[in-house]
Amino acid sequence: MAQALPTKALINGSWVDGSGGTFPVHSPQSGALIADVALCDAGDVARAVEAARAAQPGWAATPLIERVKIMRQIHALFAARAEEVAQVLIIEIGKTVAEAREEVHEYAAPSWQKAGEEVLRHRGLSFPSTQEQTNNKRLVLTHRPLGVVGVITPYNFPTDIASIALAHIIAAGNTAVWKPSEFSPICCNMVAEICTEAGLPPGVLNVVHGMGEVGAAIVDHDDVDGLFFTGSTATGKRIAAKAALRPHLLELGGDGPVIVLADADIDAAVEGAMNACFYYAGQVCTSGERLLVHADIHDEFVSKLKARASQLRIGDPGLDDTEMGPLRNSATLGRVVEHVEEARAQGAEITQYGPQEGLFYPATILTGVTPEMTIAREETFGPVAPIIKISSIPEAIAIANSSKLGLIASLWTRDLATAWRVGEALQHGTVNINETSNYWDQLAPFGGTGNSGVGRELSQWFLERFTEQKLLVFDLGDTEVRYNRRAEGGW
C-alpha cells in the first residue's frame, strides 16, 4: 500500500483513538489480521454529533457552488486513489479484482460528482396565491437541510453505498455522523481521508467505528435529525421504531425473484442468473434469491446453468482471473449452510461447484425447491441458486409476491405485453426486464416495498428525503383593496 492503513475515528476534523480501545479486522480469505481499528463508544458518538451540530449552520450557509466544488474535488481525488481503495476492498471484504474496481471506479468515486450536479438542479417553486382575489401574495417553496444525519452502512458495498448516501446528504447542506460496518472500516476511512483532503470542513463528516452499540448510540441521540441505514430487515425495523418522527431512509433485505418464462432467451437468462446469484458470492441485497423457471424450459435452463457454474473460477480474490471469492464473515456462512442443509433435508437436490474451506462456500444450485422452504422465503445472502419449477405466469406472480420483502425482481421474456403486465403485477420496487436483478441506475429511484425498506434513494430522491420543504409567503403590500372573506361569506 502507498500509505499506512487508516484505522482511527474521525471527529471534528481530527483522527482520534476510540474510547473503547480497538477491535481486529481480519481478511476473509486468509484469516490474517489486517489491522486493529479504533473502537468507539457512546461518548465518542456524542462528541461526533456535537461536532456535526456545530459545523452544520456554517456548512449550510456555504454558497452552493462552493459546496459543489468540494464535491468535484472529492471525485477527482477519489478517482486518483481508486486503485488503492480497490486493493483494500479485495483484502478487507474479499471482493474479486473486477468487483472491487467496478465498485470504486463505476459507482463510489463518481457519486460525489453526480451528487454535486444533482444538488444544482434541486430547485424550488414560485407561484401565486389561490386564496385571495388580489395580486398581493407570492409563495416561494424552498428546501432546507435537515441538520445532522446519522449514516449506518453495510460491508458488501462499503465505499459505494456510503459515497452515494454521504455525497447527497452533505451536498444538500447537512452534516453527518457515519458508522461503517465493523467488517469494512478501513476502506471507509479511506473515503473519509479523501473527503478531508478535498477540503470538507471539520465536523461536516465524522466517522465512528464499532459494533451495533455504536450504531444504536447514533440512532438514540436526540440531536440527530435524520437517519440513513442499509442492512438487515430486523435492524431496520428497530431503527424505524426509534426514528419516530425523524425522516429516515432504510434499504433492507431482498427476496430476489428471477422469473424465467417459457419464451425467454435461455442463454441470456442463464448469464443473468449467474450474475444474480454469484456476484460477490451472493452478498448483495439485489441478488437472485430464488429462480422461478417455467416447466417447458426448466431442464434446459438447469443444464446450462450447471455447465456455466462449473466454469466459475473460485479462489483468491486478489488474482485477476478469480470470479468469486469468500463470504465475509462466519455469521453469513452459517446462514447459508443452514438454508442449504434444511432444503436438502426437505428433498431439494444440491449441486455444488468449488471447495468449502474457511469462509469460501461453493457455488450451489438447488433443484426441486418448493416455495415453503426457508431458502425460498428468506434472504440467504450467499452463492446459492434455488430453482422452483413453475407451470404458469399467475403461479410465478403468486410465488414472487408471497414474500414480505419486495426490493427488486428480474423477469425474462421476449413478449412486450407479458413483460408489461407481469412487471406491473410484481410487488417490488424495481422490476428488471431481461436483465439481472443486480442492475440499478444511479439516476433512477431505488428502494423496496414491504419489509425491504422505507423511501427511495439515489439522485433527486435522496435530496428530497434529506431536505425539508419550506414555504415563504410574501405580501407585496400594494394598494389594492383586499378581498373581504367575512363580508362575502367565505369565512
Predicted regions located by residue number:
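A short hydrophobic/small-residue beta-strand
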Residues: T175-V177, I350, T430
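Hydrophobic face of amphipathic alpha-helices that form TPR/SEL1-like repeat modules
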Residues: M1-Q29, F466
